[in-house]
Amino acid sequence: ALDGAFLCYDAESGRQYYDEQFSDMNAQRERLGMTIMLARYLQTHENEKFLAALKKSVAFVRREVYDAATGEVFNFADKYSAWLRLYNFPWVSLLLAEVYPVLGDKTLLSDAYEIMAAYYERGGANFYPNGIFVRELIETFKANGLISESEKLRTEFLAHVEKIVERGVNYPKHEVNYEQTIVTPAVSFILDAYLLTKDERYLAAIQPHLAALERFDGVQPHYMLNNIAVRHWDDYWFGPIHSFGDTLPHYWSSLSSIDYIKYAGATGDDERLRRGVCGLRDCLCLFMRDGSASCARLYPFEVNGVRGERFDPLCNDQDFALFFAYKYLP
């Protein structure tokens, strides 16, 4: 079932790590960021070993992660879900769109559309997904002849954005009640609606969300606290330390950074560009000189008797930050 999957890797023991019961350490969900990053790299580099690994990973995703007939995306291998997790759908759609320039298989794009259609059929318009760029999917479909699919997704997306604008800063709870990556999708989606339509009202609607997002940011001189959005529970879920406590940085902090970079590109806001680039570069400290990486850094000295001030040894899904760096750093 796991043939071709990219799994977590424990840098201390030198072994792969897999836990089907603890779903943040399985082969799906955020782990798909590894394949997304590899696809982005292979768009500009030639490497036969990496290409072979990508093909095996895509085969795994098609076999185990989603149903091409229905667009359903699953939480676990063998196309199994104990509950609906809408976060997963756009990530798989993004993965297929990133792989398309490498493999040139147009069914990847038609599958990417079906997944987004399934996402909206299951209530996605009331959800705030993170790490997804719907405008780019719309434009990719159009550029590759999927005109009807592009128009349908555009309609769904703009209706989704209208709900976000209407709701304002009364954010709905998701897997937690309130956190940084409930705000980042509001900024990203409203901004993409502006870039699609050039409707100036979106630039006005985005301002309260930008103000809310900035409240998560550290402004201290140390690189782990400088334009890094604070997060609290990530090392409990994504690393074997399993400790609560501020994770500074965690790769999802970079979602704030790319929102600032995209906003600067649309408006010419040089200060937000500086802050976005700074925060995204700071997140790259999760990648070590020896080629290993960390899912998060537990920042406090100690949390409930557990030693902190260290990088978690598990290489989990931090490759999203590297993907964003490839995509957005000047």
Predicted feature locations:
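Short amphipathic alpha-helical interaction patches enriched in hydrophobic/aromatic residues
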Residues: 169-172, 264
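Well-ordered alpha-helical scaffold segments within catalytic/enzyme domains
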Residues: 22, 30-48, 90-105, 121, ...
